[in-house]
Amino acid sequence: MVADLRREARDVEEEVERIRRRAEQDAAEQTERVRREAEQIRRHAEEAAEAIRERAVADAELRASRAEAAARDAIHAEREQIRAELDEDLRTQRTELRGWDSRLTQREQRVTDQAASVEERLRRLETREAELAVREAGLDSRESDLGELEEARRRELERVAGLTSAEARTELVKVVEDQARLDAAVRVRDIEARAEEEAEDRARRIVTLAIQRVASDQTAESVVSVLHLPSDEMKGRIIGREGRNIRAFESVTGVNVLIDDTPEAVLLSCFDPVRREMGRITLTALVSDGRIHPHRIEEEYARAEREVAAKCVRAGEDALIDVGIAEMHPELINLLGRLRYRTSYGQNVLAHLVESAHLAGIMAAELRLPPAIAKRGTLLHDLGKALTHEVEGSHAIVGAEIARRYGEHEDVVHAIEAHHNEVEPRSIGAVLTQAADQISGGRPGARRDSLESYVKRLERIEQIAAERPGVEKVFAMQAGREVRVMVVPELVDDVAAHLLARDVAKQIEDELTYPGQIRVTVVRETRAVGMAR
């Protein structure tokens, strides 16, 4: 069996050998065939490449010849275009040169004509100079003759008139001065009339706008405070045994206590509103507590002093906030707050200052001026009224000195001292302060005046106008708001009437203190009377 297997193995090996030799033979044949095919393909490719190269060379030569022809055509066309442009430029330059030649020729002609004209004028001037020399000689001779004639005429005039030349000159100067004064007065009247018309319209518009934008309540205040009591029995406790309590209260506070038949009420009277307010607070605390005796009165009065001082500071700060002012010296704020308890003709001074500051700020804004200085000066313009009982002098001057002492701007100080014309106003802010003060205090119902001072003011107004020469009658009308002056027409002409109205108004403004404004009207009436018989 092993032998069979070995034979089969040898047979298989032989078969494998045969297959291998056959495969090698087939591979060699196939390789030869492929080589021949590749050689044939290579020859075909070389032939095709040669043909393509020949065609490419031919195409390149053709394109080169075409490009050369196109370049020659382009060069020729560009050369022609450049030649045409050069010809056009040359023609233009020739045209300009011909124009310049023409203008130069014209200018030369004008220069020649001007030279001839100048020569002609020189000849005329020489002739004129000769004529003037002759006339000057004649004028000198005539001037000498005229001088002699003038001297003779002057001597004759002096002989006829009985006046020397100096006296005649003085008389002539006086006549000219009178005429110039009359012309000046007429012109001043016309200028003032036009200025018043324009200024009145604008001022009316500004003031009306300011009043419309400021609406404030106003109540008249008096020098008496009323304190309500829980019962009439409290009046006896206020009086005390043998009047001990009421005497102690009046001596400590400086406030008079008026006890009458009015049920459940007592009156506190004092000209100083600050002391009256401290007395009211003191008595209110005593009545509420029920213990009324001299020692208790002193304690409550000390507490009332501190309370009123705090209220003054708070009132001053509230006024600054209301007006829109950021900073101010603490002492000025305190003095400003004290004005809360002071009145002027029944008008609360602090309320008047706040209202006036708003008015001044609005008017300054309408005039395109910074409102800060106007508001500040107007708010402080009555500052001196807080110290008029303690310092001598008018409240305007005192207030200005206080403001200057505490570092206020000089414009603010000037507005304070000039608001009653004790110092001549030199700035618009001072004039605005005056206007705001007059608007706030002069509107109906803002202030009240006593009958005695009112009558005295009317009498003085009529007296001021009656003292003028040529015045026939004077009438104070409309509660002293208008003065009508009747003049003698033979003594006062139209120009003098205008000057009289201005002088009377100025004197009233300088001498008197009054709310609002006063109109002075001068009436000059000429009557012609004829009798039919």
UniProtKB/Swiss-Prot annotation:
Which is a GO BP term held by this UniProt record? mRNA catabolic process
E.C. code: 3.1.-.-
Underlying gene: rny
Q: Which UniProt keywords apply?
A: Endonuclease, Hydrolase, Nuclease, RNA-binding
The record describes the protein's role as: Endoribonuclease that initiates mRNA decay.
Quick one: where's region Disordered?
Answer: 16-41
Where does the source fall among the domains of life? Bacteria
InterPro entries given in the database record? HD/PDEase_dom, HD_domain, HDIG_dom, KH_dom, KH_dom_type_1, KH_dom_type_1_sf, Ribonuclease_Y, RNase_Y_N
Here the segments flagged for biased composition (Basic and acidic residues) are 22-41
Kindly give the SMART domains that the UniProt entry links to this protein: HDc, KH
Listed name of the protein = Ribonuclease Y
For this chain, the annotated S-S bridges are none
Instruction: Describe the location of the HD domain by residue ranges.
Output: 349-442
Q: Which GO terms describe its cellular component?
A: plasma membrane
Coiled-coil positions are none
Question: What lineage does the source organism belong to?
Answer: Bacteria, Bacillati, Actinomycetota, Actinomycetes, Frankiales
Q: Which GO terms describe its molecular function?
A: RNA binding; RNA endonuclease activity
